[in-house]
Amino acid sequence: YDGVSISDMRASLIMSARTKVELEPNYSYVTARILLDELRSEALSFLGVAEQSTQQEMFDYYPKALQAFIEKGIELEMLNPELKTFDLNKLGKAINPDNDFKFTYLGLQTLYDRYFIHSNDIRYELPQIFFMRVAMGLAIEEEDRENRAIEFYNLLSSFDYMSSTPTLFNSGTMRPQLSSCYLTTIPDDLDGIFSAMKDNALLSK
C-alpha cells in the first residue's frame, strides 16, 4: 500500500519466509538475512553511522559502529566505562561481518528479542559487536587484553564456543555477573535437605 515503510515491508517478508522453513530449511537463513537487514538499519541509524548498508559496506561500518556503540552504551550507563580504554581501532578491524551470515532465523531472532542491548526498545547492538562486547568483558583483566579479546571474539563469532546466558547478558556491562550457578549449603538432616530443594526450586523459578 502507499506509504508503507521499509521496516514494515521487512516484517511482512519475515512472516512470509519463516513459514517456509519447514518445507526448505535454507529459508531459515533467508529469513535471518531479512531480519539482519532490519537490525542493521535500526542499529546503524541509532548510532549515527548510516541509514542502510550493503554487506561490503559493513567492513567499513562495523569498526565505526563499535566505537559509537561503546560511547553510547557508556553514555546511557549500560556499559562499563573501562571498555573505552581498549584499543577500539584494533578490535574493530578484527570484526568479521561475514560471520553475521552464520545465523539461522531462530538464533538471530532470539538474540534480537532477549540479548542485544537496547534503549527505548531500539536495538543498537549488532551481532558481531555483541560478541566483541562479551569478549572485551571477559578480557578486561588480562595483561594483553586486546589480543585476548580478539581470541575470545573469534571463538564466539565462529560458534566454536558459546558462553552461558549470564555471560552473554552481562559481560562488559555495568552488571558484570557472569556466573550461571549458585553455591548453597545443605544441613545434614531430612528437614534441611528438603528445605534446600524447595529453596533451589524457588530460585530457579
What positions do the PLM features span?
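Extended catalytic cores of very large enzyme megasubunits
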Residues: 1-205
